Every structure is written in structure tokens, then in C-alpha cells.
Amino acid sequence: MNENLFASFTTPTMMGLPIVILIVLFPSILFPSPDRLINNRLTSIQQWLIQLTSKQMLSIHNHKGQTWALMLISLILFIGSTNLLGLLPHSFTPTTQLSMNLGMAIPLWAGTVITGFRHKTKASLAHFLPQGTPLPLIPMLVIIETISLFIQPMALAVRLTANITAGHLLIHLIGGATLALMDISTTTAFITFIVLILLTILEFAVALIQAYVFTLLVSLYLHDNT
């Protein structure tokens, strides 16, 4: 299949609307403001999920780290919404682009590191040299710890990109195989279609899990620097 070289730079659309608008509006549609005195079951489940996620991520933080609560909740909702919208047919998944994921990972990582150097300068510098290190190994360990620090945003972005891209490729390949097998063997095509359905369900779980993992790792980086 031939594609335009610059197709990845065009604004992705869905039903004629820019997908950015749908991504921004998706959390507000999924989690509307309650207008009842007593919440219904759906609203109660939504609030329980938000409280559970907040508790998992913020229980390890002190007061300084808990000021990032709104940022972390917004981040997991944004990534989760983007991943789920990307599973719709004929849609574009922005989180398959390494440039976008780096654009999220680098500022968040840099913010946690700057916070650590501002409020815990000695403790942040101490991470570069573990206590009790032999004198001949000091230069090597400082270099290794520095490299590991700068690899963190790359690991965040590559993990999210690789998992989402791999899932979409598998769905595309198995879907194409199902269409090709329909003219050859109906039974084999049906079995492949069942596998495709199961893989799609798995991708829904992966979309949410990857959003949680990305946000959790940012939360852990923040915990190390506050």
C-alpha cells in the first residue's frame, strides 16, 4: 500500500472533525459533572475509579508531591482517552508517534528533576554516587547514573509507543488474514475472526494499562525528587 510521505504530518480527523477536539472532549463526556443529589451507578463507578487511581498514585507522596495530583489525573485521562479513540476503525492514534510521547515524557521528567534539585539538592546529587562506592569506581558510576537518569524519558516514550504500535499492527495483520481466508476456508476464517475479537479486547486492556503505567512511572520519578 502506497502512502504519502507527509501523511503523518496532516491533522488527523474523524467524521470530518479534528481528532484533537474529540480527545479533549472525551474525558468531559466520559466523566460528566454530577447534577443529582444522589449519584447513579455510573457516576459512582466513575468517582470510585478516579479515587482508586488517585490513591494508588498519591499515597506515596508527601504534601509537595500531592500538588501534582491534578496533573497526574489529567495525564492518565488524556493518554487513556487517546489510546481508546485510536482503537476505533479508520482513526489515528497519536500515541503511536514517538515525537508526541517524547513531547509528554520530557517536560514531565524535567519537571520532576528540577523539583528535586530545587528542594532536595543534596539528596538529588547523592543519587549520582551511591554510598560506600570504592574510590576507583566513582567516575564510572557517576557516568552510569547520569546516563540512566537521561534515559528515563526515552524509556517512558518508547514503552508507550512500542506497546500501542505492536497491538495495532497485530490487529491489522490478523484482520487482513481474516479477509484473505474467507475465500479459502470459512472455518479457518471464523477461528481467525475469534482471535481478532479476543485481541481487540486485549488491546482495550492494554490501552488503559499503558496509560496507567506511564502515569505511575511519572509519579515514581516525582516521588524520588520530592
From Swiss-Prot:
Keywords: ATP synthesis, CF(0), Hydrogen ion transport, Ion transport, Membrane, Mitochondrion, Mitochondrion inner membrane, Transmembrane, Transmembrane helix, Transport. Its main location: mitochondrion. GO terms for biological process: proton motive force-driven ATP synthesis; proton transmembrane transport. InterPro entries: ATP_synth_F0_asu (IPR000568), ATP_synth_F0_asu_AS (IPR023011), ATP_synth_F0_asu_bact/mt (IPR045083), F0_ATP_A_sf (IPR035908). The chain crosses the membrane at residues 12-32, 68-88, 97-117, 138-158, 164-184, 189-209. The keyword Transmembrane applies. It is found in: Mitochondrion inner membrane. One of its GO terms (cellular component) is proton-transporting ATP synthase complex. CDD domains: ATP-synt_Fo_a_6 (cd00310). It catalyses: H(+)(in) = H(+)(out). It is a multi-pass membrane protein. One of its GO terms (molecular function) is proton-transporting ATP synthase activity, rotational mechanism. It comes from the Eukaryota. Subunit a, of the mitochondrial membrane ATP synthase complex (F(1)F(0) ATP synthase or Complex V) that produces ATP from ADP in the presence of a proton gradient across the membrane which is generated by electron transport complexes of the respiratory chain. ATP synthase complex consist of a soluble F(1) head domain - the catalytic core - and a membrane F(1) domain - the membrane proton channel. These two domains are linked by a central stalk rotating inside the F(1) region and a stationary peripheral stalk. Component of the ATP synthase complex composed at least of ATP5F1A/subunit alpha, ATP5F1B/subunit beta, ATP5MC1/subunit c (homooctomer), MT-ATP6/subunit a, MT-ATP8/subunit 8, ATP5ME/subunit e, ATP5MF/subunit f, ATP5MG/subunit g, ATP5MK/subunit k, ATP5MJ/subunit j, ATP5F1C/subunit gamma, ATP5F1D/subunit delta, ATP5F1E/subunit epsilon, ATP5PF/subunit F6, ATP5PB/subunit b, ATP5PD/subunit d, ATP5PO/subunit OSCP. NCBIfam families: ATP_synt_6_or_A. Belongs to the ATPase A chain family. This is ATP synthase F(0) complex subunit a. The gene is MT-ATP6.
